[in-house]
């Protein structure tokens, strides 16, 4: 089967069409702007899969309808998923703009005095607003000389933010969410909303009963040689934590081996269902070898699977990580309990950063007073105002231990193409695999247990659906916190100590939901959240605006908020603008 190509970025150099002196004097400068933009994007960006980003430049500068149509024909044939229009001069507004209604688009008008690039920018944006096709404005803060070919830092920041978000939009379009199972324990996010995926994300939902997973395991619809490799890898790398079950529920060595084997098989089969596996065609399973074209998935597990079979904790943790028995590789996006809305937040974070995502329960707010009462320890530093305990048995990527290192030697999570095998091994070494608690998981299983290193910047996100309003996005930037070991142990043992933990301190603003840490917890819209490495809330805001998903809660600096120019016409308060604009324009892929 032909491999689906990755979306490309289209660069549209537009120009004043008046011949006999005007156009001719601008051709080189305009095309050089396009080439410089393409060079910046290809140098600084990668797809989430690690592949290089490609830019497609119009064959000619665009002065009017004919050249705009020729450019569109070229872009359509090369899978261009977003466009950036560039110009140093006046051009003919509505005659030269990108009219595709679902393709993210930005316009960079050069800030110079010799030619009015800013005037074209304003005219073109007015046309976009009047036609109901929002576009992003890029205009440098400082005037440049006409022969200055550099890209100013503020322009570069907007170009990259737009491109990252636009590539995420284009990469999700046409893919599917694999809903493996149904509703888990009444969790609303696992009531998978097909209309949300179709209308806002341009995706389909592939609903598959969990019996399909059982069939693949029982009928050996998998690569048996790979299973042996996976078992050998686990034997070499897994450290096992204590079994906290009562004696009558503890498994012997043979039973434990069977649980491990099935857990690894679940990872293999879920992966194969998502992306396909040509090895299955070799054993006569051609249909199954194709997969479901899934860019994200969720596994119900509880309770209709886990009351009888091993839980999904091991499978989900391995799939979400940037490595397995095949070495370092692209992480998958798999939501525990089939929480599709948390899965979408994971997908957004992965597409924007290329990194693995940490799925967690937003479990407990610990005030400084409560911690001092229980442990005798007085919180300070990043944790001085209190912390949130993020913990879940399921699909927290092992990268979340933060045993990888950045260029300064600080703990972090990196995109897989920057991760060394030594760093992957360090994440495994920091993880214990604890037998599942029988009262919750009667079929057994293993939960990963690690503790996230402190001082690491994170962005916590969540998508919720509100009846009558639609999807909304929550964002909380903050840091992981490291507690003294005895303090961590006391707090952790008050809950399920066999699960991975991140102690999270959101950045406070003193206003609204970020008045204090308690308010962050109290305003969180569901029981789950996602941690994405870095303070990348601004990228999430830009992406959400492209999809027409309003942001109901964030602590990103106002100067970093970047949305289409038309949002400014929807009122004077920028968050109210967001709601009104999203309601006005409706879902990106209206249905």
Swiss-Prot record:
One of its GO terms (cellular component) is cytoplasm. The keyword Lipid biosynthesis does not apply. It comes from the Bacteria. The active site is at 337 (proton acceptor), 361 (proton acceptor). Its EC number is 5.3.1.25. Mn(2+) binds at residues 337, 361, 528. GO terms for biological process: D-arabinose catabolic process; L-fucose catabolic process. It is found in: Cytoplasm. It catalyses: L-fucose = L-fuculose. Pathway: Carbohydrate degradation; L-fucose degradation; L-lactaldehyde and glycerone phosphate from L-fucose: step 1/3. Belongs to the L-fucose isomerase family. PANTHER family: L-FUCOSE ISOMERASE. Homohexamer. Converts the aldose L-fucose into the corresponding ketose L-fuculose. NCBIfam families: fucI (TIGR01089), PRK10991.1 (NF008220). HAMAP family: Fucose_iso. This is L-fucose isomerase.
């Amino acid at each position: 089967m032909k491999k689906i190509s990755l979306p490309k970025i289209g660069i549209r150099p537009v120009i004043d069409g008046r011949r006999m002196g005007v156009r001719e004097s601008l051709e080189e400068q305009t095309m050089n702007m396009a080439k410089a933009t393409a060079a910046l994007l290809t140098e600084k960006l990668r797809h989430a899969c690690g592949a290089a980003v490609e830019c497609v430049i119009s064959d000619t500068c665009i002065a009017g309808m004919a050249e705009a149509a020729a450019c569109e024909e070229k872009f359509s044939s090369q899978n261009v998923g977003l466009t950036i229009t560039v110009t140093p001069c006046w051009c003919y507004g509505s005659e030269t703009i990108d009219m595709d209604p679902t393709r993210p688009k930005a316009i960079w008008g050069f800030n110079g005095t010799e030619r009015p690039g800013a005037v074209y920018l304003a005219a073109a944006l007015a046309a976009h607003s009047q036609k109901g096709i929002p576009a992003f404005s890029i205009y440098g803060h400082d005037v440049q000389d006409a022969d200055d070919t550099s890209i100013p830092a503020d322009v570069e920041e907007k170009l990259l933010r737009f491109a990252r978000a636009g590539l995420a939009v284009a990469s999700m379009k046409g893919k599917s969410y694999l809903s493996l199972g149904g509703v888990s324990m009444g969790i609303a996010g696992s009531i998978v909303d097909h209309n949300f995926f179709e209308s806002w994300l341009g995706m389909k939902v592939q609903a598959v009963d969990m019996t399909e997973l059982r069939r693949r395991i029982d009928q050996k619809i998998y690569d048996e040689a790979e299973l042996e490799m996976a078992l050998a890898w686990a034997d070499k790398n897994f450290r096992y934590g204590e079994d906290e079950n009562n004696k009558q529920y503890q498994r012997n060595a043979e039973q434990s081996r069977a649980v491990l084997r099935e857990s690894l098989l679940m990872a293999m089969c879920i992966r194969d269902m998502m992306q396909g596996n040509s090895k299955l065609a070799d054993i006569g399973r051609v249909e199954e070898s194709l997969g479901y074209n899934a860019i994200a998935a969720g596994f119900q597990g509880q309770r209709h699977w886990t009351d009888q079979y091993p839980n999904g904790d091991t499978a989900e943790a391995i799939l979400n990580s940037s490595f397995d028995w095949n070495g370092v590789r692209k992480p998958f996006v798999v939501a525990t309990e089939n929480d599709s809305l948390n899965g979408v937040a994971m997908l957004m974070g992965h597409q924007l950063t290329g990194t693995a995502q940490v799925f967690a329960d937003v479990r407990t707010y610990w005030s400084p007073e409560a911690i001092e009462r229980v442990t005798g320890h007085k919180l300070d530093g990043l944790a001085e105002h209190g912390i949130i305990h993020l913990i879940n048995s399921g699909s927290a990527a092992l990268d979340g231990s933060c045993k990888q290192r950045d260029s300064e030697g600080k703990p972090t999570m990196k995109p897989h193409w920057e991760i060394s095998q030594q760093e992957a091994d360090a994440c495994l070494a920091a993880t214990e695999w604890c037998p599942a608690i029988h009262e919750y998981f009667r079929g057994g299983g293993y939960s990963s247990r690690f503790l996230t290193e402190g001082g690491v910047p994170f962005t916590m996100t969540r998508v919720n659906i509100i009846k009558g309003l639609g999807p909304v996005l929550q964002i909380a930037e903050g840091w992981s916190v490291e507690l003294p070991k005895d303090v961590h142990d006391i707090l952790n043992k008050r809950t399920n100590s066999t699960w991975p933990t991140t102690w999270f301190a959101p950045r406070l603003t003193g206003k609204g939901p970020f008045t204090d840490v308690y308010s962050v917890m109290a305003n969180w819209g569901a029981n789950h959240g996602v941690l994405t490495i870095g303070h990348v809330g601004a990228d999430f805001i830009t992406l959400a605006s492209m999809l027409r998903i309003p942001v109901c809660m964030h602590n990103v600096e106002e100067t970093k908020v970047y949305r289409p120019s038309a949002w400014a016409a929807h009122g004077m308060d920028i968050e109210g603008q967001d709601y009104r604009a999203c309601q006005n324009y409706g879902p990106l892929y209206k249905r």
